[in-house]
């Protein structure tokens, strides 16, 4: 084998080994891993690991026969199950399908995701009814979190969506949300958010 072929083979082997290691890290972590942390663990250059992540994402996300995919959120990567299999995963975990969000929670979540950061009082005004319990449910489900406080008397809490919200709805970032114009046929929702 020539020296050039030997080097190419060595590079391919190293690349495959690193992909395997990164795949293991994502699997074991269960949580999103920052690219800088992956680089530190595998002791490789940021750009090189970023390219490997892109290759891994293409492999996982491009193969419809796989039940898992790699998502990227705010500079982190996570191995997750594909949403098309959620019905079966719920059966395995014996989750109650009735754990869905109430109409009030869905309305509040829609307002928060399009108007964030926003206070509870502003949500109440848009909905026309109190939203405290709906917001509390969203916080419990880790779809919404306190993002700060408004600098006015009383310093009301500002709410915004979480990374869990993005994962739950298979979004990379808030820019992936459907345009509010798409909801104009459903005047109730668009009227609430546009107010």
Swiss-Prot record:
Gene3D superfamilies named among the record's database cross-references: Winged helix-like DNA-binding domain superfamily/Winged helix DNA-binding domain (1.10.10.10)
Cysteine disulfide links: none
Organism classification: Bacteria, Bacillati, Bacillota, Clostridia, Eubacteriales
Record note on quaternary structure: Homodimer. Homodimerization may be required to stabilize the binding of ScpA to the Smc head domains. Component of a cohesin-like complex composed of ScpA, ScpB and the Smc homodimer, in which ScpA and ScpB bind to the head domain of Smc. The presence of the three proteins is required for the association of the complex with DNA.
Entry's family note: Belongs to the ScpB family.
Function description: Participates in chromosomal partition during cell division. May act via the formation of a condensin-like complex containing Smc and ScpA that pull DNA away from mid-cell into both cell halves.
Classification via InterPro entries: ScpB_csome_segregation (IPR005234), WH-like_DNA-bd_sf (IPR036388), WH_DNA-bd_sf (IPR036390)
Organism (species): Clostridium perfringens (strain SM101 / Type A)
Subcellular location, record wording: Cytoplasm
GO CC terms, sorted: cytoplasm
HAMAP family for the chain: ScpB (MF_01804)
Protein name, as recorded: Segregation and condensation protein B
Primary residence: cytoplasm
Keyword set includes Cell division: yes
NCBIfam families reported for this sequence: SMC-Scp complex subunit ScpB
Pfam families the record matches: SMC_ScpB
Any one biological process term the GO annotation gives: cell division
Key words, A-Z: Cell cycle, Cell division, Chromosome partition, Cytoplasm
């Amino acid at each position: 084998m020539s020296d050039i072929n030997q080097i190419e083979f060595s590079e391919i082997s190293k690349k495959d080994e690193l992909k395997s290691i990164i795949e293991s890290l994502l699997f074991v972590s269960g949580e999103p891993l920052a690219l800088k942390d992956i680089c530190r663990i595998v002791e490789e250059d940021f750009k090189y690991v970023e390219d490997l992540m892109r290759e891994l994402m293409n492999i996982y996300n491009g193969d419809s026969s796989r039940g898992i995919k790699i998502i990227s959120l705010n500079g982190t990567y996570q191995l997750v199950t594909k949403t098309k299999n959620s019905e079966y995963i719920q059966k395995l975990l014996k989750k109650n399908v009735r754990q869905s969000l109430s109409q009030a929670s869905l309305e509040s979540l829609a307002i928060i995701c399009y108007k964030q950061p926003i206070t509870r009082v502003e949500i109440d005004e848009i909905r026309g009814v109190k939203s405290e319990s709906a917001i509390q449910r969203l916080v419990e489900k880790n779809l919404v979190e306190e993002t700060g406080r408004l600098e006015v008397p009383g310093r009301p809490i500002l709410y915004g969506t979480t990374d869990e919200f993005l994962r739950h709805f298979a979004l990379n970032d808030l820019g992936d949300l459907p345009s509010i114009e798409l909801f104009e046929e459903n005047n109730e929702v668009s009227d609430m958010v546009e107010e």
